[in-house]
Protein backbone atom coordinates (compact mmCIF):
# COMPACT_ATOMS: atom_id res chain seq x y z
CA UNK A 1 0.00 0.00 0.00
CA UNK A 2 1.11 3.56 -0.67
CA UNK A 3 1.48 6.10 2.11
CA UNK A 4 0.74 9.69 1.08
CA UNK A 5 2.04 12.63 3.10
CA UNK A 6 0.99 16.26 2.64
CA UNK A 7 3.23 19.00 4.01
CA UNK A 8 1.66 22.45 4.18
CA UNK A 9 4.05 25.38 4.55
CA UNK A 10 4.01 29.16 4.44
CA UNK A 11 5.07 29.01 0.79
CA UNK A 12 3.11 26.13 -0.67
CA UNK A 13 2.34 22.44 -0.36
CA UNK A 14 4.54 19.39 -0.90
CA UNK A 15 3.09 15.91 -1.53
CA UNK A 16 5.15 12.79 -0.84
CA UNK A 17 4.57 9.11 -1.38
CA UNK A 18 6.25 5.91 -0.25
CA UNK A 19 5.64 2.20 -0.71
CA UNK A 20 7.69 1.17 2.33
CA UNK A 21 7.80 4.29 4.57
CA UNK A 22 11.57 4.33 4.08
CA UNK A 23 12.09 5.89 0.65
CA UNK A 24 10.00 8.95 -0.18
CA UNK A 25 9.39 10.90 -3.38
CA UNK A 26 8.08 14.46 -3.13
CA UNK A 27 6.46 16.84 -5.60
CA UNK A 28 5.96 20.56 -5.08
CA UNK A 29 5.55 23.26 -4.39
CA UNK A 30 1.87 23.07 -5.20
CA UNK A 31 0.04 26.38 -4.63
CA UNK A 32 3.42 28.11 -4.77
CA UNK A 33 3.90 31.09 -2.43
CA UNK A 34 0.54 30.50 -0.75
CA UNK A 35 0.19 29.69 2.94
CA UNK A 36 -1.16 26.17 3.47
CA UNK A 37 -2.32 25.91 7.08
CA UNK A 38 -4.52 22.85 6.55
CA UNK A 39 -4.55 19.73 4.40
CA UNK A 40 -6.26 16.37 4.37
CA UNK A 41 -5.87 12.96 2.72
CA UNK A 42 -9.50 11.82 2.48
CA UNK A 43 -9.61 8.07 1.83
CA UNK A 44 -13.34 7.52 2.38
CA UNK A 45 -14.28 7.27 -1.29
CA UNK A 46 -13.23 4.87 -4.03
CA UNK A 47 -10.74 7.52 -5.18
CA UNK A 48 -8.63 9.24 -2.52
CA UNK A 49 -9.02 13.01 -2.51
CA UNK A 50 -6.41 15.49 -1.32
CA UNK A 51 -7.64 18.78 0.15
CA UNK A 52 -5.56 21.90 0.78
CA UNK A 53 -6.61 25.11 2.48
CA UNK A 54 -4.39 27.68 0.77
CA UNK A 55 -4.24 31.44 1.33
CA UNK A 56 -2.94 33.91 -1.23
CA UNK A 57 -1.83 37.37 -0.14
CA UNK A 58 -3.62 38.71 -3.22
CA UNK A 59 -6.70 36.54 -3.59
CA UNK A 60 -7.32 35.35 -0.05
CA UNK A 61 -8.10 31.78 1.08
CA UNK A 62 -9.34 28.98 -1.15
CA UNK A 63 -10.10 25.30 -0.71
CA UNK A 64 -8.54 23.16 -3.42
CA UNK A 65 -8.76 19.42 -4.06
CA UNK A 66 -7.05 16.81 -6.17
CA UNK A 67 -8.34 13.40 -7.24
CA UNK A 68 -5.02 12.31 -8.77
CA UNK A 69 -2.75 12.57 -5.71
CA UNK A 70 -1.70 16.12 -6.42
CA UNK A 71 -1.02 16.07 -10.15
CA UNK A 72 -3.91 18.47 -10.85
CA UNK A 73 -6.05 20.64 -8.60
CA UNK A 74 -9.57 22.06 -8.69
CA UNK A 75 -11.35 24.77 -6.74
CA UNK A 76 -14.83 26.22 -6.35
CA UNK A 77 -15.23 29.54 -8.21
CA UNK A 78 -15.45 32.47 -5.76
CA UNK A 79 -14.45 30.24 -2.85
CA UNK A 80 -16.23 27.30 -1.25
CA UNK A 81 -15.79 28.55 2.33
CA UNK A 82 -17.36 31.98 2.66
CA UNK A 83 -19.35 33.84 5.28
CA UNK A 84 -22.94 34.54 4.27
CA UNK A 85 -23.93 38.05 3.34
CA UNK A 86 -24.51 40.13 6.42
CA UNK A 87 -22.11 38.21 8.67
CA UNK A 88 -19.69 41.13 8.66
CA UNK A 89 -16.63 38.93 8.32
CA UNK A 90 -14.33 37.39 5.73
CA UNK A 91 -12.38 34.16 5.95
CA UNK A 92 -8.68 34.90 6.41
CA UNK A 93 -7.27 31.36 6.73
CA UNK A 94 -8.52 27.78 6.70
CA UNK A 95 -6.96 26.21 9.78
CA UNK A 96 -8.59 22.80 9.83
CA UNK A 97 -10.07 20.28 7.38
CA UNK A 98 -11.68 17.15 8.84
CA UNK A 99 -13.89 14.43 7.34
CA UNK A 100 -17.30 14.25 9.00
CA UNK A 101 -19.23 11.22 10.16
CA UNK A 102 -21.51 11.08 7.09
CA UNK A 103 -20.90 10.51 3.40
CA UNK A 104 -19.64 13.67 1.73
CA UNK A 105 -19.44 15.56 5.04
CA UNK A 106 -16.40 17.78 5.55
CA UNK A 107 -15.77 20.29 8.34
CA UNK A 108 -13.53 23.34 8.18
CA UNK A 109 -12.25 25.51 11.02
CA UNK A 110 -11.27 29.04 10.09
CA UNK A 111 -9.81 32.35 11.12
CA UNK A 112 -11.69 34.36 12.29
CA UNK A 113 -13.06 31.75 14.66
CA UNK A 114 -15.78 29.86 12.83
CA UNK A 115 -16.69 26.35 11.72
CA UNK A 116 -18.18 25.51 8.33
CA UNK A 117 -19.69 22.20 7.19
CA UNK A 118 -20.01 20.72 3.72
CA UNK A 119 -22.37 17.89 2.79
CA UNK A 120 -21.29 17.66 -0.86
CA UNK A 121 -17.67 16.64 -0.54
CA UNK A 122 -16.28 20.16 -0.23
CA UNK A 123 -17.96 21.86 -3.19
CA UNK A 124 -19.88 24.19 -0.86
CA UNK A 125 -19.98 24.93 2.86
CA UNK A 126 -22.49 26.34 5.33
CA UNK A 127 -21.55 28.37 8.40
CA UNK A 128 -22.30 26.81 11.80
CA UNK A 129 -24.35 29.84 12.77
CA UNK A 130 -25.10 28.69 16.30
CA UNK A 131 -21.38 28.81 17.04
CA UNK A 132 -20.75 32.01 15.10
CA UNK A 133 -23.52 33.77 17.04
CA UNK A 134 -22.52 32.32 20.41
CA UNK A 135 -22.84 34.86 23.26
CA UNK A 136 -19.26 34.09 24.37
CA UNK A 137 -17.82 35.25 21.04
CA UNK A 138 -17.28 38.82 22.17
CA UNK A 139 -14.96 37.55 24.91
CA UNK A 140 -12.95 35.10 22.83
CA UNK A 141 -9.40 36.24 22.26
CA UNK A 142 -6.72 35.50 19.71
CA UNK A 143 -3.72 33.27 20.14
CA UNK A 144 -0.28 34.22 18.88
CA UNK A 145 -1.25 33.02 15.40
CA UNK A 146 -4.72 34.58 15.38
CA UNK A 147 -8.19 33.57 16.54
CA UNK A 148 -9.14 30.29 14.89
CA UNK A 149 -10.96 27.03 15.38
CA UNK A 150 -8.01 24.68 15.00
CA UNK A 151 -9.77 21.53 16.26
CA UNK A 152 -12.95 19.97 14.89
CA UNK A 153 -13.82 16.49 16.19
CA UNK A 154 -16.89 14.77 14.73
CA UNK A 155 -18.42 12.04 16.84
CA UNK A 156 -17.85 8.68 15.10
CA UNK A 157 -21.46 7.48 15.54
CA UNK A 158 -23.56 10.56 16.34
CA UNK A 159 -23.75 13.06 13.45
CA UNK A 160 -25.39 15.67 15.70
CA UNK A 161 -22.39 15.75 18.07
CA UNK A 162 -19.34 17.87 17.29
CA UNK A 163 -16.52 19.01 19.58
CA UNK A 164 -14.41 22.02 18.61
CA UNK A 165 -11.64 24.10 20.17
CA UNK A 166 -10.17 27.51 19.53
CA UNK A 167 -7.35 29.62 20.77
CA UNK A 168 -8.20 31.62 22.72
CA UNK A 169 -11.62 30.45 23.83
CA UNK A 170 -11.47 26.81 24.84
CA UNK A 171 -13.43 23.66 24.04
CA UNK A 172 -17.10 23.69 22.96
CA UNK A 173 -19.53 20.91 22.08
CA UNK A 174 -22.86 20.60 20.33
CA UNK A 175 -25.19 17.62 20.62
CA UNK A 176 -28.03 19.02 18.52
CA UNK A 177 -26.43 19.44 15.13
CA UNK A 178 -25.01 22.89 15.83
CA UNK A 179 -28.11 24.67 17.11
CA UNK A 180 -26.50 25.20 20.52
CA UNK A 181 -22.97 24.95 21.88
CA UNK A 182 -21.77 24.51 25.47
CA UNK A 183 -18.28 25.21 26.86
CA UNK A 184 -16.42 22.08 28.04
CA UNK A 185 -13.42 23.41 29.97
CA UNK A 186 -13.85 22.44 33.61
CA UNK A 187 -10.39 21.66 34.99
CA UNK A 188 -8.33 23.29 32.20
CA UNK A 189 -5.96 25.94 33.54
CA UNK A 190 -5.50 29.43 32.09
CA UNK A 191 -2.05 30.47 33.32
CA UNK A 192 -2.27 33.93 31.81
CA UNK A 193 -5.12 34.92 34.17
CA UNK A 194 -4.79 36.01 37.82
CA UNK A 195 -4.44 33.10 40.24
CA UNK A 196 -8.00 33.28 41.52
CA UNK A 197 -9.38 33.24 37.95
CA UNK A 198 -7.29 30.47 36.38
CA UNK A 199 -10.11 27.96 35.89
CA UNK A 200 -12.78 29.93 34.00
CA UNK A 201 -15.84 28.54 32.24
CA UNK A 202 -14.24 29.46 28.92
CA UNK A 203 -11.34 31.47 27.54
CA UNK A 204 -8.55 28.90 27.89
CA UNK A 205 -5.76 28.82 25.31
CA UNK A 206 -6.27 25.23 24.17
CA UNK A 207 -3.74 24.30 21.47
CA UNK A 208 -5.13 20.97 20.22
CA UNK A 209 -7.66 18.26 21.13
CA UNK A 210 -7.86 14.69 19.85
CA UNK A 211 -9.63 11.39 20.50
CA UNK A 212 -9.76 7.81 19.30
CA UNK A 213 -12.91 6.81 17.35
CA UNK A 214 -13.36 3.66 19.44
CA UNK A 215 -13.43 5.74 22.66
CA UNK A 216 -15.35 8.89 21.70
CA UNK A 217 -16.01 9.82 25.32
CA UNK A 218 -12.26 10.18 26.02
CA UNK A 219 -10.54 13.37 24.87
CA UNK A 220 -6.90 14.42 25.13
CA UNK A 221 -5.83 18.07 25.05
CA UNK A 222 -2.57 19.96 24.72
CA UNK A 223 -3.05 23.35 26.33
CA UNK A 224 -0.90 26.48 26.32
CA UNK A 225 0.17 25.21 29.72
CA UNK A 226 -0.96 21.69 30.55
CA UNK A 227 -1.74 18.31 29.03
CA UNK A 228 -5.16 16.93 29.91
CA UNK A 229 -7.51 13.97 29.60
CA UNK A 230 -11.28 13.94 29.80
CA UNK A 231 -13.26 10.73 30.25
CA UNK A 232 -16.67 12.37 29.81
CA UNK A 233 -16.38 14.13 26.44
CA UNK A 234 -14.95 17.29 27.91
CA UNK A 235 -17.28 17.62 30.88
CA UNK A 236 -14.29 17.53 33.25
CA UNK A 237 -10.54 17.46 32.61
CA UNK A 238 -7.63 15.97 34.57
CA UNK A 239 -3.99 16.98 34.23
CA UNK A 240 -1.74 14.23 32.84
CA UNK A 241 1.39 16.27 32.19
CA UNK A 242 3.24 16.06 35.50
CA UNK A 243 5.86 13.56 34.22
CA UNK A 244 6.70 15.59 31.11
CA UNK A 245 9.72 17.93 30.95
CA UNK A 246 7.31 20.71 29.98
CA UNK A 247 3.54 20.82 29.68
CA UNK A 248 3.68 23.47 26.95
CA UNK A 249 3.39 22.37 23.35
CA UNK A 250 1.12 22.31 20.34
CA UNK A 251 0.39 18.84 18.85
CA UNK A 252 -1.19 15.85 20.54
CA UNK A 253 -1.82 12.66 18.56
CA UNK A 254 -3.61 9.39 19.39
CA UNK A 255 -2.57 5.95 18.13
CA UNK A 256 -4.81 4.55 15.35
CA UNK A 257 -5.20 1.13 17.00
CA UNK A 258 -4.47 1.68 20.71
CA UNK A 259 -6.78 4.29 22.22
CA UNK A 260 -4.65 4.67 25.37
CA UNK A 261 -1.49 5.56 23.41
CA UNK A 262 -0.80 9.23 22.72
CA UNK A 263 2.17 11.37 21.69
CA UNK A 264 3.14 14.96 22.44
CA UNK A 265 6.08 17.15 21.46
CA UNK A 266 6.92 19.37 24.46
CA UNK A 267 8.44 22.82 24.00
CA UNK A 268 10.23 24.90 26.59
CA UNK A 269 7.34 27.31 27.13
CA UNK A 270 5.51 30.28 25.72
CA UNK A 271 8.70 32.34 25.74
CA UNK A 272 10.98 29.47 24.63
CA UNK A 273 9.32 27.68 21.75
CA UNK A 274 11.83 24.94 21.18
CA UNK A 275 12.27 21.62 23.03
CA UNK A 276 13.67 21.57 26.57
CA UNK A 277 17.48 21.64 26.36
CA UNK A 278 16.98 21.91 22.56
CA UNK A 279 16.77 18.10 22.33
CA UNK A 280 14.07 17.01 19.90
CA UNK A 281 12.06 14.31 21.66
CA UNK A 282 8.64 12.81 21.18
CA UNK A 283 6.99 11.69 24.40
CA UNK A 284 4.63 8.71 24.33
CA UNK A 285 2.16 7.44 26.88
CA UNK A 286 0.71 3.94 26.61
CA UNK A 287 -1.64 4.31 29.57
CA UNK A 288 -3.72 7.37 28.67
CA UNK A 289 -1.26 9.80 30.22
CA UNK A 290 -0.54 8.13 33.56
CA UNK A 291 3.14 7.73 32.59
CA UNK A 292 5.38 8.92 29.76
CA UNK A 293 8.49 7.74 27.90
CA UNK A 294 10.65 9.87 25.61
CA UNK A 295 11.90 8.74 22.21
CA UNK A 296 14.40 10.59 20.10
CA UNK A 297 16.72 8.17 18.28
CA UNK A 298 17.40 9.79 14.92
CA UNK A 299 15.97 13.18 15.89
CA UNK A 300 18.43 16.09 16.10
CA UNK A 301 20.03 17.78 19.07
CA UNK A 302 20.48 21.56 19.04
CA UNK A 303 16.92 21.77 17.71
CA UNK A 304 15.93 25.39 18.23
CA UNK A 305 12.58 25.30 16.45
CA UNK A 306 9.06 24.20 17.25
CA UNK A 307 6.43 21.87 15.84
CA UNK A 308 3.00 23.38 15.24
CA UNK A 309 -0.34 21.94 16.34
CA UNK A 310 -1.18 20.27 13.00
CA UNK A 311 2.40 19.44 12.03
CA UNK A 312 2.47 16.06 13.76
CA UNK A 313 0.26 13.16 12.69
CA UNK A 314 -0.02 9.38 12.56
CA UNK A 315 -0.81 6.91 9.78
CA UNK A 316 -3.03 3.81 9.98
CA UNK A 317 -0.30 1.16 9.68
CA UNK A 318 0.60 -1.24 12.47
CA UNK A 319 3.12 -0.47 13.84
CA UNK A 320 2.00 3.09 13.34
CA UNK A 321 3.98 5.67 11.45
CA UNK A 322 4.43 9.04 13.14
CA UNK A 323 5.37 12.18 11.22
CA UNK A 324 6.35 15.69 12.21
CA UNK A 325 7.33 18.84 10.40
CA UNK A 326 9.34 21.62 12.01
CA UNK A 327 9.49 25.36 11.56
CA UNK A 328 12.95 25.07 9.99
CA UNK A 329 11.45 23.16 7.04
CA UNK A 330 12.56 19.67 8.06
CA UNK A 331 10.19 16.69 8.02
CA UNK A 332 10.78 13.56 10.09
CA UNK A 333 9.18 10.11 10.04
CA UNK A 334 9.02 7.07 12.29
CA UNK A 335 7.73 3.66 11.23
CA UNK A 336 7.79 2.08 14.70
CA UNK A 337 5.30 3.97 16.88
CA UNK A 338 7.62 6.96 17.26
CA UNK A 339 10.60 5.12 18.74
CA UNK A 340 13.18 5.75 15.98
CA UNK A 341 13.24 8.50 13.37
CA UNK A 342 14.71 9.53 10.04
CA UNK A 343 14.57 12.78 8.10
CA UNK A 344 12.53 12.52 4.89
CA UNK A 345 12.59 16.16 3.72
CA UNK A 346 14.71 19.23 4.41
CA UNK A 347 14.97 22.92 3.58
CA UNK A 348 11.26 23.44 3.00
CA UNK A 349 9.59 26.65 4.15
CA UNK A 350 8.12 26.95 7.65
CA UNK A 351 5.94 23.83 8.10
CA UNK A 352 2.39 24.50 9.31
CA UNK A 353 0.59 21.19 8.70
CA UNK A 354 1.47 17.53 8.06
CA UNK A 355 -1.21 14.97 7.17
CA UNK A 356 -0.97 11.37 5.97
CA UNK A 357 -3.18 8.72 4.44
CA UNK A 358 -2.76 5.14 3.25
CA UNK A 359 -4.16 4.38 -0.21
Residue ranges with predicted function:
Residues 1-359:
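Extracellular glycan-interacting surfaces
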Amino acid sequence: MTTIIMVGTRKGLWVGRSEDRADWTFTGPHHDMEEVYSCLVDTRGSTPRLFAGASSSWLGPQLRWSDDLGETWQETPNGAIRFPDGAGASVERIWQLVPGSGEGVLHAGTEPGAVFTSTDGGASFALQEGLWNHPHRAEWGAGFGGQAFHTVLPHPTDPDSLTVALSTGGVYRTTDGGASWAPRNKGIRADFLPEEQRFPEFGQCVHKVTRHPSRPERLFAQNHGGVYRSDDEGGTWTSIGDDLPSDFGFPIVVHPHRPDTIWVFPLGGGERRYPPDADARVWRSDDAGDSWTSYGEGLPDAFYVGVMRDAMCVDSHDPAGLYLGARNGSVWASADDGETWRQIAADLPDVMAVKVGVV
